[in-house]
Amino acid sequence: MGKISIAIDGPASSGKSTVAKILAKQLNYVYCDTGAMYRAITYLALQNQIDIQAEEPLVALCVNHTISFQQAENGQRVFIDGHEVTEAIRQPDVTNAVSAVSKHAKVREEMVALQQKIGQAGGVVMDGRDIGTAVLPKAEVKIFLVASVEERAERRFKENQEKGIETDFETLKAEIERRDYLDSTREVSPLVQASDAVKIDTTGLTIEEVVAAIQNVIKQKGFELF
């Protein structure tokens, strides 16, 4: 059986990237973290003091800089023009600004075109906010992950602790709620479950349990990949 495309969508900190990395490794597929692309543009904008509300300068960043990936043992390394930014794009200032950048229609056009180029050959696990609806609408398997705000804030809190980033739990909850609102209400490619996506609530589930649930969906659709 040929390689398929797997789209995993969901709100911030719902577990998308973690399970997508594991699935890609299990299947020997390419893993594409589309959120990292928007984070990279956001990072460039902040570094160059570009107004994140101004669309044209952001589009220029997309056109004039090259975002690339390298597969790594624990997922994926991210580069801008050959310089690694894997950790830099996960800092709080980028996290809090990325929704404002990704709402711009022309920025999304540039990013979606690049993402579709990566995914056109199949054999890819791609995660983001609009993969099943806009980027890979014909993906054979579409998953929509959700989790409670409290659980997602707890995950982000632990991630920040491990990175030595001091954050307040209630502040994280407020930030996640704000991102949910921005992502789901933007005019271009809002966060929405594709009509043919399978919804999985990851609240209270381990990573292994979520991966197993997705494996079951794949098998139920007739793809014996494992």
UniProtKB/Swiss-Prot annotation:
It catalyses: CMP + ATP = CDP + ADP; dCMP + ATP = dCDP + ADP. Its main location: cytoplasm. CDD domains: CMPK (cd02020). It holds the Pfam family Cytidylate_kin. GO terms for cellular component: cytosol. It is found in: Cytoplasm. The keyword Cytoplasm applies. The keyword Transferase applies. One of its GO terms (molecular function) is ATP binding. It is an enzyme of class 2 (transferase). SUPFAM superfamilies: P-loop containing nucleoside triphosphate hydrolases (SSF52540). Keywords: ATP-binding, Cytoplasm, Kinase, Nucleotide-binding, Transferase. Disulfide bonds: none annotated. Its EC number is 2.7.4.25. ATP binds at residues 10-18. GO terms for biological process: nucleobase-containing small molecule interconversion; pyrimidine nucleotide metabolic process. HAMAP family: Cytidyl_kinase_type1. Belongs to the cytidylate kinase family. Type 1 subfamily. This is Cytidylate kinase. It comes from Enterococcus faecalis (strain ATCC 700802 / V583). The gene is cmk.
